[in-house]
Every structure is written in structure tokens, then in C-alpha cells.
């Protein structure tokens, strides 16, 4: 009988994970701040998925320094296969013979990262908030784990993990801390930190951070971890809602399985929003707004504990199964805590992000499809709000199609069926069709649905009927401001009393995108009457400063320059520098030169491009 080899369904890995599956990884690493490297070993437990037909294991690697390889304790032959961009250099480990179906072997690889590692960021003390110690953190999604250690770097394989990490500074990892296991510091001032991840996770959720980190409780099963000088304000920001959010989603899906839900607030130079690493969400400090209004990021990352981390897209071509579901669940949490109109308000903001992304790529672009073709591509290149918002709109459409109460019964069924597994869009489709097969009304509606258009048509999907009650009031307020000075409108502090920070954000966005511009006097008046310049909420303050810069209002120059020295998230930094440069180029360049060492290298390079163009021009 001929051997049937199923080709792997993930095109972005070079591993032969169709022959072998890693079931457990022990990661032993020493964090070398002076060299900006990790050094140590990884031990994989591999299960054979063939009847002894494979006598070698191929793993993903990228810019790694491999020392030696042992199989079941014995030195093994290994070689690098030819490098293939953008996926790296496959590591081929030779076995003496094939292994029977479901039998295990142990592979121990000594490894050191290199300066070309794409997953690790090393911050100088100057880039942290109290500027005392260096800091490092990882970001493995989508295909960067392979630059830390050899692995099957695909979301289609999940394994349990043990972390044994040695560092001179406290360590966070994507496992439960083995409490009380930290040894006394060794003579070299380093401490061993241990973590265990009992729930199988894909490689992209492998996470490490180390720096001057302290913890404080924010709920019965949650802590926030951050720099000691920021601990109090982070605790206040998160302690009111974290457990409320967990309770809300547990009612929608089923109980939280990871033990603890913790949040690591990264240094202010962190250039991104957040990452759903299990047990410890990694988050931007810009969510700490002193008004508890920006923590929808936490609702999103928490929702990943079910969608993405427990039930996972089998490849990045089906990324909407992670992010569309997570955005859907995030908005269900918001509705449960704040009311249904807030879900629609969030979806309206999301629809704007979706139209922006479609405009960016072009309405016919492959990356605007729900299911993308990533053969030969780097999944990072396809990253946008499309899988989040087109995915959300698809699920919202399905909810409206079958009815909310019926869809609510499907949610826990789906998350139970694929718990601990990975799936693709076709399995999702067959699962929902099967679930409703005995309900003639829902079944007919689902079978008549144009699945192919939802899955494969580029561009925008049909726009749903959203409840616009929460945006109408701010659209109206923006119109009144834009009617000045030719109208009788007299702005009062009461205009925005009772509005959420996100409503104020939408109001300011309307002013920014309008053809009509405010005068410098009106911009200043807006800031004074509404207290916008003094807002601790960066989402609000940065947009108000953009409005002021666009209007030519000199009163925002000082606070803009001040903010640019405190936050490194590109979402805020890049537009502020662009607008500052248009108004006062000298001030923009001076501000950038003053703070350049504070910014993350990615952010620094992008702002340099924005301010000075390409270096060779």
C-alpha cells in the first residue's frame, strides 16, 4: 500500500510537522543583557505521526547559532538546508531509523540567538520609564519564534511548555509562575525563574520579558506587572474592570482555563498596542489613561484566551478565525459591561478602520479577502484591520442571520469542539452548518448564504445596520464647531459632559478629516473649554494636539513636544511628528533629536523616514 503523505496546510513553515508533532518543549535560557542574546537549550518531545516512514525531523530556524543536537541523549547528525526567504533556514536532524506511529523521541538542541533575531527587542535604561535598568521582551507572532529557538513554527501545532530562565532582573513568561521556585541569586547576581504552561499553545505564543518589573493584584486571579514607579497607576486603571470582563466572557463562552489572567504593561517606548501572550497579556502603557476608558485593549486580549489561544487558526491564511472571533467577543464583553449600544459604537469605529485598510491596499487586493493566499509570503505583510473587522462583520452577519439567541448556543459549542485544536475556515463552515442542521429556518439561511463571497471576495463586505445613537451626538457637535464663526453656537463645558473618551475621539476625528479647518483661536478655545490639552487619555490628547497643529495653534506646541518624549507607540508618534513638522519643522526636528534614544528602533526608523525621507535622497 503506497504511503499517503498529507502536505501541511500551513504554507509559512518549512518544518515537516506532517510527520512529527512537538508535544512538549523545555526552554532553558540565560538572558545575556550585555550581549543582547539568549543562550541555552531547548528540549522537544516529538511524537511520530507516521508508521516509521520518516527518518529525519525538519525544524524552522532563522539566524540562530546552533551548538549541538542530541536525540534520546545521543549526539545526532544535523545540517542546515538551503535558506528560503522569508522563512529562514530549515534545520534537518537525522535519525538512525523511523519511529513507530505515536512513539516519542526527545531532541535536545543547544542554541544561542544572534543580533539578527527578529523576535527580541532589547531596550536601554533610557528607553524605560524610571531609566534604571535594561529591559528585553519578545514578540513572536507571526513567524518570529524560529529566531529564538528551532521549532515547528506554525499555529497548526500546539505543545505544553516549561520555562527555566536565568536573569539578573525579574522575568515574565507565557506560563504560570512556579511560585516559590525562584532560587536565591547565584554568585553572578542572576536568579532562575520557572514557569509552566499546562495548556498546549502554538509557537507564536512563546513569550519572555525581563526588566525592572513589580507586581500588584488587580483581581482575584489577576496581577498587573510593570515598572515599580508606574505600579500604583496601572493597578488603579485595571482593578475595576478586569474581573468584570472575565466574568462577562465566561458567561458567553465557558470558564477561563489558564489559571491566572495577568497584564504586563511594557515600557513607554513599546511601539505597538498589545499581544495576547497566555497568562500574561503584553500591553502598551498608553492604555493607562487615568480614566479607565482605554482598556478595551484588555477586553480584546482577554478574549484571545478563548479565540486564538485555545481555538487557533491552522495557518495565517485563516487569521480571521483568531482576530475576527476575538473582536466579536471583545464587543460582546463591552455590551455585557456597558450596554448593547456600546457594541455598535465600537463596531462603527471598527468599520472606519476597515474602510481605511481597504483604501490602503486597494479594493481588489488579495489581502482584503477574508481568506488570503500566503504561499511564499511573509504573513506580517498581510497584517491589517481586515481579519479583525471583516471577520467581525462576518460573525455579526451570521448572528443576525440565525438570530442572537440561537447564535449564543453555537458559541460554546464551537469553542468546546476545537478546544486545544487548530482549524481552518472550511471546518468552521461545516461546524456551523452541522450545528444548525435540525433547525430548518437557520439551516436554510446558512445554506443559502453566499459563503464564497464572504471568504474570497476582495474589498468591503455589505455594511450592517448599526445603532448610531452614540455617534450621532458627536457628529452633531463636530458640525456645530465647523459652523463657527458663522453661527450662533456657543461652546460650553456641558457639550462633552457625559460623553465617553471614545466619543470625544470620534468628535476630534470628525474635526480632523473635515474640509473646513478651525482657526487657531477656535482650536485654543476648544482645548480650554473642554480641558482637552490636560487630558491624561493619550487617545484624546494626541488627537486634540493634531487638531491644534493642523489649525496652526501655537499653544499646543509645548504639550505636543512633551507628549512625544513620553510615549513611543507609533499610532500616536508618527502622525504627531508629521503634523508638527508641517507647522514648525525646526521644532519637530529638535524634539526628535532630543528623544531619539528613547524610541524603539522600528519607531525611530519610521519617524526618520517621515521627517527626512529616505537617507539617500
UniProtKB/Swiss-Prot annotation:
Top enzyme category: hydrolase
Entry annotated with the keyword Hydrolase: yes
Annotated positions binding Zn(2+): 300, 304, 323
Keyword NADP: no
PANTHER family, alphabetized: LEUKOTRIENE A-4 HYDROLASE
Family: Belongs to the peptidase M1 family.
Protein name per its UniProtKB record: Leucine aminopeptidase 2
The organism of origin for this protein: Neosartorya fischeri (strain ATCC 1020 / DSM 3700 / CBS 544.65 / FGSC A1164 / JCM 1740 / NRRL 181 / WB 181)
